[in-house]
Structures are given as structure tokens and as C-alpha cells.
Amino acid sequence: MQITVLGAGAWGTAVAAQAALRHPTLLWGRDPAQMAEIAATRRNQRYLPDADLPARLVCSGDWDAALAHVSARAGTDADANGAGLVIVATPMAALREMLARIPQGLPTLWLCKGFEAGTGLLGHEIAREVAPQLACGVLSGPSFALEVARQQPTALVAASQHESVRDAAVRALHGASLRVYASDDPVGVEVGGAVKNVLAIATGIADGMGLGLNARAALITRGLAEMTRLGLALGARAETFMGLSGLGDLVLTATGDLSRNRRVGLRLADGQTLAQILAELGHVSEGVYSAGTVLERAGRLGVDMPITAAVVAVLQGGLAPRDAVAALMQREARAES
């Protein structure tokens, strides 16, 4: 099985390292110099400096070579194990471009989480627009890139309407340290991956303010309710949000100190400006970029998301963290739902 991973950030590098343990794998990045350095040092010094990469992982900045690697056997083997797989590991902002450039015959997964800025679309909706014939899906779940690259135990979910894509994801990545479950609810899996980033910022704010473990538990639980309401309005199944891509990813991102979104919340509570925080992080924090889009999409659907609304107000500078917490606590009493 031939695998190409498009995007040499931390997560793309980690997934490529896992895939290379079992299959011929190529990691592609936009910067040929960076890819040459990764190939020579077997480390991604910019995004994942603390993980050694397998010697058999091929690194390239050549787009044509990346597609040729995975196209060589796709569709030519009677044995399904010979089919190739493309894994898109770019930020959400580049997913549309990537999907439009991938040949329609190649099974494809994306790793990015969030709603597309401007359109408010999820990944599967973008795919429907730009590559309607592409067999594709999403790989998501509670996972920090460094732990995956170091082969620490992790469980993910591959969601697609195409059984061939789900099967390819399991064949490509399921192994001793990585379990991959299959799902046919990409909507639910994507909503979970998008909303948990915003909720992690909220939890980071609460923890940074020293509000205690009770407050953390309340935010995670009520945040899960927000996530589920939005997902149901978009056509997802409720049970998906109790799985890896919903509750699992939310708990990890909201409580794990490797989470960039959580760190944004912690620093906002400490009085730093958003500009200062993003400059210091140096990497993408999807929750910052997707929070407003999540709230806008929810508004169009008539879905109430008070925690998300509070995060957006803080990120936009219209509300201090302490005032946001006070506003949430002063909401009218209601039945739990």
C-alpha cells in the first residue's frame, strides 16, 4: 500500500511517521529546502523537533513526485491492499486547494479540524463542492502529534461515506500503538473536531483564572451539549459525540497542556493579547480562527451556543475573560439538555 501525506506540519509528520512503519510512505511539504533538511536529519526541526522519523520515510517538496508515489499502484492491483491513500495534513484554509488538485481516483483523508473561514463549510462540504467524485473522508480523534510520532498508545476514528476509504485508513495506520476505528458519520466527526478547539480555549481561560475543577467539568460537559446540538442540526448522529472525535477529543484538548487552544485560553486569562499569544505560539491554533465561523453557522441554524459565544467575545476583545465567566454563570436557569 502506497501512502502520500500532503503537509509537513507537526500532525502530518507524525501521521507519516506512523504510516511509514508499515507501508511505503512519502511526506510532501511546500518548501523543498525544509523537506531536504527533514530527509537529511530525520527530524522536523520546525514543527516536531523532539521526534525521530523512520529511515524509510521519503520526504519531498515535489508535488508531481508525491502524487506519482501514491498513484503508481492505485487501481492496478486486484488485491485491495495495493490501493494507495492520500492524507491531507494541511490547515483547514488549504483543504479546498488540496482537494481540487488530487486526482479523483485516489482515496483521500484529511486531518484538519474546523470550519472554513468565509464559507463556514466543513471538510466534507468543501469536498462536495470541489471534488464531488472523490472518495474521501476525515481522520480525527484525541491525539497530540508528538505522542503519535513517539508511538505512544492512541486511538483515532476514520469517518467516510465510502467503505473503501474507511478500510484504507485502517489498513494504512492501524497497528501496535495506533488503533483506528471506522465510522460512517463524517458530519459528526467533523463537528466534534471543529467545536472542541473553541471549547478548549474556554477551559483554558477558566483554568488560567483558577476557577477550579468543578468549573472545568461544567465547561466540558455543557460544551459537549453545545457540540451535540450543532451536530444534530447539521445531520450528525448523537452517539458520535460520545466517541473519540467528540468527548474524547474534547477532554484531551481541554485538559492537555500540549493543546495550543488550551494554551491560548490560559494566556488570555493571564492578560496577554491575542496578537501576543499567536506570535509566541508560532503554530496554527484552529480554535482562534474557527470560533467566529462556528458561532455564525450555529446562528444560521438557530442553535444556542453560549460558551462559544463567550469565547468569540473574548477573542474579539469585546469582553474580558472574567466578565465572560460571569455572563455564563448569570444565564437564566433551565433544564439540562
Curated annotation (Swiss-Prot):
Catalytic activity: sn-glycerol 3-phosphate + NAD(+) = dihydroxyacetone phosphate + NADH + H(+); sn-glycerol 3-phosphate + NADP(+) = dihydroxyacetone phosphate + NADPH + H(+)
Residues binding NADPH, per UniProt: W11, R30, K113, A145, R260, V284, E286
EC number: 1.1.1.94
Any GO CC annotation of this UniProt entry: cytosol
Domain of life: Bacteria
Keyword list, A-Z: Cytoplasm, Lipid biosynthesis, Lipid metabolism, NAD, NADP, Nucleotide-binding, Oxidoreductase, Phospholipid biosynthesis, Phospholipid metabolism
Family the entry assigns: Belongs to the NAD-dependent glycerol-3-phosphate dehydrogenase family.
PANTHER family, A to Z: GLYCEROL-3-PHOSPHATE DEHYDROGENASE, GLYCEROL-3-PHOSPHATE DEHYDROGENASE [NAD(+)] 2, CHLOROPLASTIC
HAMAP family: NAD_Glyc3P_dehydrog (MF_00394)
Name of the featured protein: Glycerol-3-phosphate dehydrogenase [NAD(P)+]
Biological source species: Leptothrix cholodnii (strain ATCC 51168 / LMG 8142 / SP-6) (Leptothrix discophora (strain SP-6))
Organismal lineage: Bacteria, Pseudomonadati, Pseudomonadota, Betaproteobacteria, Burkholderiales
